[in-house]
Amino acid sequence: GCYGFIGFNFLQKLIKEHKDEFEVTGIDLLNNSYSKLNYQQLNTGENFEFLSENIIDINKINFKKNDFDLVINFAAESHVDTSIYNPDVFIQTNVLGVNNLLKFCLENSVKKYIQISTDEVYGSTRNHYFEETDILNPSSPYSASKASADMVCNAYMKTYDMDIKTIRPANNYGPFQQPEKLIPFSISNIIENNEVEIYGDGSNIRHWLYVKDTVEGIFKVIEKGESGEIYNIGSGIYHNNNEIAEKLLSKFNLSKNSIKYVKDRPGHDFKYAVNFDKLSSLGWSPKYDFENALEETTEWYLENKNWWSEGIVQIRKNRDLRISLARNAYKK
């Protein structure tokens, strides 16, 4: 998943700041216009090998070398709406794909494995801040597939004594996020003079985390994380969807009258919240102020319309279709 959202932000830092420290092999399916553009624009240098492959077929890939010290898995199907009406691809990529990666690591004596999970595996909350030891209670097929992957990782660790660490970030935002997600979808709609669509009444709360803070957290786990441990990554910043929409609209001198409320997503979780003291104990802390990071993100989408404009029309069509199919699936 090296050319996806978090994976690409991680890869950029790895290549730009640590290019002489590692030999890196990246795998990505390149199954959308955004990952293809990411692939085209990054000068990776001599220490990087890229393979356009599916992790489900990891054992069929011909690597130039396979004596890896570390595998980090960013690859995932991640759109909740899609998972409601088409869960199969989520099980294939997020569960079977992870199983195949772990088998590859086991068979090739890979020393360490890091699974990038999500805070959504804990399920919804009102006042509780989930800790890494809390029981998983996923609500959507997407989060269930990620929770299943976490359990597969746990089983491989216990059965085969593998060095596995799991990272569960909060809701990420920032440059290179596909515009089907709330913040970039809203920004792109505003730029193109469309209404900002919000599910339900907009009261759903998310724990917002700038992607560059996430990347730093991953590097900290690589550096200091302990085998078998799970690490939440959070920021302590919480906003509901109405607040996010209003903040973005205000940057363009627009009022909340530009918000369009649409029928809520089936099984929409009210709030995600995680305690990230364990990662903080390793010496990590979020560095980016939310307002400044949101401004930086907005500027990036303004300056990089060529990156997202090709796919946004289809995303809007798919969004309408997904909402309709998801509701019908839920009714059945």
Regions from the PLM with identified roles:
Residues 1-172, 296, 304-307, 313, ...:
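N-terminal Rossmann-like NAD(P)+-binding domain of SDR-like oxidoreductases, especially those catalyzing
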Residues 5, 78, 177, 239-240, ...:
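Short alpha-helical
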Residues 9-13, 30, 53-54, 190-332:
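C-terminal substrate-binding subdomain of Rossmann-fold SDR/epimerase-dehydratase oxidoreductases
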Residues 36-37, 84, 179-180, 208, ...:
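Conserved strand-to-helix beginnings and helix N-cap segments that scaffold or border functional pockets
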Residues 59, 81, 88, 99, ...:
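Residues in well-ordered alpha-helical elements
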Residues 128, 179-187, 263:
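A glycine/serine/threonine-rich, flexible loop-to-helix segment
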Residues 138-145, 169, 175, 179-183, ...:
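The catalytic Tyr-centered alpha-helix of NAD(P)H-dependent dehydrogenases
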Residues 148, 152, 156, 186, ...:
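Hydrophobic alpha-helix immediately C-terminal to the catalytic Tyr-X-X-X-Lys motif of short-chain
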